[in-house]
Amino acid sequence: KEGLAPYIAETALRNLYLGSGIKEEEIEKYFKQFAKDLPGYLEDYNDEVFHQAGTVDAGAQGGGGNAGTQPPATGAAAQGGAQPPATGAAAQPPTTQGSQLPQGGATGGGGAQTGAGGTGSVTGGQRDKDVDAGTTGKITVPKLKAMSKKMRLPKAKGQDVLHLDFLLTYKPQQQDISNTRATREEFDRWYEAIKKEYELDDTQMTVVMSGLMVWCIENGCSPNISGSWTMMDGDEQTVFPLKPVIENASPTFRQIMHHFSDAAEAYIEYRNSTERYMPRYGLQRNLTDYSLARYAFDFYEMNSRTPARAKEAHMQMKAAAVRGSNTRLFGLDGNVGETQENTERHTAGDVSRNMHSLLGVQQHH
């Protein structure tokens, strides 16, 4: 128990190295010590085991049921008036002529009856299915690897540049890596700039951002908008300047507003659950299906979960919104005058201001 070397009896060592035999008196000393230290060991050692020829359900739980079919007793024991076991008691082992059952002192209270009862089955218990030697095992379908080692991978200096195990677990959200949405750093910078310009705290900014989202649902988020935006405080209209909202938006204001796409979609759906509501973006495009109202705002961000019908409707509305728009890379230059130096020299004998003398030929009017 403490990790020490195994104990070897002195008699065994003497017999091993000296070749001397072992006397019965020496063995008796060990036997007496066993009887003193481990009394239960000797009682279990002296137990007699009887085997019955009945059927036993080894999988059933409990030990209070019948052990199985009782084989008929033969010999003197059967003629001596042996009684069958009572219902619920352990089955008695078969006896033959000349054999005696162990008494209580010899068995120490755990004799053959207890041993047989411990392996008995509960009456009415469910039997385990026997194993048939002719049955076959379950055939499993082989599973292919998600990424095979045989596929051609990009290599640099003879080594793969991709980590296949990482790719199997790398499943980012499409919106988080999309280049049509402002990064989190850009959004944080835009938020802090508006918070500083409006001189508001975080709790007040949540109300202002909610009002700005609803205003953009109705009026769009074109980078060309200017002036002010409004939100309602009950029946009172509150006006906020648009300049800090547009100027601090990077890369564009629409890419900033893409962060509000899911919230705006849920807001429109909520409004439609209480009243008939279509955003102004959908009214301008004459969208008649109110089930598509949740997609009728210009900063809606399409993803893999967007239905095909909703994608088509949103694309048609976007095409109608941008039709006829002409974005010029360069405007009219303010310096419209032409500065060109005239190096021509004219004399009085020239035909005209733009024509020199042609060998005395005079121009008549």
UniProtKB/Swiss-Prot annotation:
The keyword S-adenosyl-L-methionine does not apply. GO terms for cellular component: viral capsid. GO terms for molecular function: RNA-directed RNA polymerase activity. The record marks 52-53 as: Cleavage. It is an enzyme of class 2 (transferase). It comes from the Viruses. This is Genome polyprotein. It comes from Sugarcane mosaic virus (strain SC). The lineage of its organism: Viruses, Riboviria, Orthornavirae, Pisuviricota, Stelpaviricetes.
